[in-house]
Design a protein with these regions (language model features):
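Thiamine diphosphate
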Residues: 1-174, 183-188
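Short beta-strand-to-loop junctions in surface cap/lid or active-site-entrance loops
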Residues: 191-195
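Conserved small/polar residues in nucleotide/adenosyl-binding loops
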Residues: 197-199
Length: 199
């Protein structure tokens, strides 16, 4: 059961993502990171600074990035592909479906700027349909981390999980819900509060 929930402290999930990627990169030389010209916004640029030979900026070519991710995964790499959620799922749906989900390749799509809180980017960058699009794909595991602490646990967990994953994170800082690490498991939920009424 989660006991420490919704403190006043906040952290950004993108910062947690980049920190966890760097830590994972030190432990596993098969981790490769791709980005689609948004590495400063997705925070993957930090990984590229530490591991320049394992970071590839694919430019404004999101569907091509997913195709490259599929190819690298087919060669045994653990691929993290990042861009904004609107581009990761909207522009790349067919490529993800045909080249990643159906062949069950080990690609981890980490999409930032999900939902409606995208700052000055406006309505054209908002993405509400991403969970629906990714959830219906065969073999795809969909994860929406609750906070930065959980995001730091999600990265190594999905690296260990064989098969495609879609991780959805927002742009803004989020309240800290989990004070400690280690509770996250792929496919498992949490009891937030016990009640007399169970729905």
């Amino acid at each position: 059961m989660v006991s420490a929930i919704l403190t006043d402290k906040k952290r950004n999930l993108r910062d947690a993502y980049s920190s966890a990627l760097i830590e994972l990169g030190h432990k596993n030389p098969d981790v490769v990171v791709l980005d689609a010209d948004l590495a400063l916004s997705t925070k993957t640029k930090r990984f590229g600074t530490v591991f320049p030979d394992r970071f590839f900026d694919m430019g404004i070519a999101e569907a091509n990035m997913m195709g490259v991710a599929a190819g690298l995964a087919a060669c045994g790499k653990i691929v993290f592909a990042s861009t904004f959620a609107v581009f990761a799922t909207g522009r790349c749906y067919d490529t993800i479906r045909q080249s990643i989900a159906y062949p069950e390749l080990n690609v981890k799509i980490v999409a930032t700027h999900a939902g409606i809180s995208v700052g000055g980017d406006g309505a054209s960058h908002q993405m509400l349909e991403d969970i629906a699009l990714m959830r219906v794909l065969p073999n795809m595991t969909v994860i929406a981390p609750a906070d930065a602490t959980e995001m730091e646990d999600v990265v190594p967990a999905i690296a260990e999980h064989e098969g495609p994953c879609y991780v959805r994170i927002g742009r803004e800082d989020a309240p800290i819900i989990f004070e400690t690490h280690g509770a996250f498991e792929v496919g498992k939920g949490y009891v937030l509060r016990l009640s007399l009424i169970h729905i």
